[in-house]
Amino acid sequence: MKGMGQIVTWSVRDETLHTESAIRLFRTFVEENPSVWNSEVQKEIINACAKVIEHEDAFIDLAFELGGVEGMEASEVKNYIRYIADRRLTQLGLPELFKIEKNPLPWMDAVSYTHLRAHETKR
C-alpha cells in the first residue's frame, strides 16, 4: 500500500503545483492588463466557483452514498472543498464565499506540500 499512498501524494502535490502556477500566471496577466479585472469578470469567477462547489457536492454525495470512510465523513470533505475554494478565491484577489475558518482536514496540508524531501521517497 505504500506505493499507492505515494502515488496519491504525488498526484495531490502535482495538482497543487499546477494550481499555484495558474494563479501566479493569472495574477501576472491581471497586473499587466488591469482593465480586464472588472466587476463583471470578478462576478463570473465567483459564480463559476459556486457552480463548481455544487458539482463537487453532488460527486461527494455519490462517493459517500454507502457511508463514511474511516476518518472522513462527507460533511468534512464538503467543508474542505469550501475551505480550499475560499483559499483560491483570495489568492485571486476575490472575497471568500464560504468563510470556513479552520481546515477541516488538516492532514491534507502535509499531503499537498509541493516540495518532496529526498528521504521521503527512498524508503
Regions found by a protein language model. Give the residues of each.
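Active-site-proximal binding-pocket segments
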Residues: 1-11, 16-29
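Acidic-residue sensor for enzyme active/binding pockets
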Residues: 15, 56, 120
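Single conserved hydrophobic/aromatic residue that forms the stacking wall/gate
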Residues: 115-123
